[in-house]
Amino acid sequence: MAEKSFDNWKKIVVKVGTSTIVQENSQINLPIIGQLVQTLCALRNQNREVVFVTSGAVGVAINQLGFKERPNEIPRQQALAAIGQADLMAIYNQNFSFYHQITGQILLTYDVFDNPKMLENMLNALRELLKMKAIPIINENDVIAVDEMDHQHSFGDNDCLAAMVTKIIDADGLIILSDVDALYDRNPHEFANAKAIKRVGSITKQVINLASGKSNLGKGGMLTKLKAAKYLLKNDKQMLLLPGSEPDGILKALSGQEIGTLFANEYK
């Protein structure tokens, strides 16, 4: 991966999950959010177009309301999503304003991708935001998408949503920040000698078997990231899986440093 050049990544989708911005004790990780925003603004200063996909609305609300865990009742999850989304955007806007960076919120559901007219309208708005040098901030609309909140048709903590956005806007690549800093040959939480896999050219059954577990506050896990990677590889796109604990790793990886796992077709 050290020899890989990402200079041609001019349009990038960056996705962050709940486990990166909300800690296990339900506290909002403001230092990480600050570093992340600084990194996204640095990408903009490199004249790259940036689309930011974020999870965390429910996790933020859990913190704000002092809940111990994510509730199972869908109406309560909807209410938390509504509260948390407003708080989450306020936190992001406060951080982005320090760098005088304009942002715009886009909330999506599966219906948007299934409806050509709705999809066209969304893309028109997103393209205009990019022309304005704004950073679109995308999240799943959990207030409306009830079926997705009980995880029957979940985007997967926005991993698959980010992959679909990457494809539909013809971005050069997707970067996913995760609580796991790479894909490993075995579970790094259980095996101290687990080794990071630097590059994956196809999502085989063997690769899928490496995925296990998920965070308590979010809906995703390594399996949803592999699902996103498989979708992107099928559409001739690339994906980087990087540690969420080090947002500036995005800049290091794009400069060619060997960080995380790159998912790319063999001929890339």
Curated annotation (Swiss-Prot):
One of its GO terms (biological process) is L-proline biosynthetic process. SUPFAM superfamilies: Carbamate kinase-like (SSF53633). One of its GO terms (molecular function) is ATP binding. It is an enzyme of class 2 (transferase). It catalyses: L-glutamate + ATP = L-glutamyl 5-phosphate + ADP. Keywords: Amino-acid biosynthesis, ATP-binding, Cytoplasm, Kinase, Nucleotide-binding, Proline biosynthesis, Transferase. Substrate binds at residues 55, 142, 158. One of its GO terms (cellular component) is cytosol. ATP binds at residues 15, 178-179. It comes from the Bacteria. It is found in: Cytoplasm. The keyword Kinase applies. Its main location: cytoplasm. Disulfide bonds: none annotated. It holds the Pfam family AA_kinase. Its EC number is 2.7.2.11. Pathway: Amino-acid biosynthesis; L-proline biosynthesis; L-glutamate 5-semialdehyde from L-glutamate: step 1/2. Catalyzes the transfer of a phosphate group to glutamate to form L-glutamate 5-phosphate. Belongs to the glutamate 5-kinase family. This is Glutamate 5-kinase. It comes from Oenococcus oeni (strain ATCC BAA-331 / PSU-1). The lineage of its organism: Bacteria, Bacillati, Bacillota, Bacilli, Lactobacillales. The gene is proB.
